């Protein structure tokens, strides 16, 4: 029986990744390096013989443009795609736009690590009159006030990502379609925690590098049997370590 595969990709480096700022739902674009990473991810997938029947991404352009670049390399720019806010990055509340290292200098490395990677820890909330509140953005006009976050923990991110997985993505995989998901560090961490049944301590230490394809293989019951990155292992480990170090004081 053929192995069922799923490809997950965190967006390439964004302009605010480059500036080491908390991004969350702020709609910042890819940096030049990020576009290069996305094209390289597409080339890797092409060289490994991947092709897709359907794509999912968020409503934030750093993920959308990553997907565009990947599909362009695969000559699949036409691929049917669904965009959902449920695949957005976690909302970083009042931290959005702040420099991570400067925030660590102010509050300490451990507090920032908990805000960035803790399971149930929420960053300080936005107020609804803050220009960063998603209720001011027309792309979220169909959401209820209860669905619009003022801040999110990873646990709250899981609460929106996993129902979307169960109701939208998994049924498509079960039907035999080959699926790629281009999303964000924390929406993908939410999915990895669920698929691999990771503990809160394990997920705290999981950092997903930008622009690197992460492949899941499933058994006939659609349970994960293997998870691996495509690319040079040393380079990927260095990129993941760099992600972890973003939240430390200089």
UniProtKB/Swiss-Prot annotation:
A GO term, aspect molecular function: phosphoglycerate mutase activity
UniProtKB keywords: Gluconeogenesis, Glycolysis, Isomerase
Top-rank EC class of the record's enzyme: isomerase
Keyword Repressor belongs to the record: no
Residues bound to substrate: 10-17, 23-24, 62, 89-92, 100, 116-117, 185-186
Metabolic or biological pathway, per its Swiss-Prot or TrEMBL entry: Carbohydrate degradation; glycolysis; pyruvate from D-glyceraldehyde 3-phosphate: step 3/5
Matches recorded under CDD domains: HP_PGM_like
InterPro entries attached to this UniProt entry: His_Pase_superF_clade-1 (IPR013078), His_PPase_superfam (IPR029033), PG/BPGM_mutase_AS (IPR001345), Phosphogly_mut1 (IPR005952)
Catalytic activity, EC: 5.4.2.11
Pfam assignment, any one: His_Phos_1
Similarity comment: family membership: Belongs to the phosphoglycerate mutase family. BPG-dependent PGAM subfamily.
PANTHER family, A to Z: PHOSPHOGLYCERATE MUTASE
Subunit structure: Homodimer.
Name of the featured protein: 2,3-bisphosphoglycerate-dependent phosphoglycerate mutase
Gene: gpmA
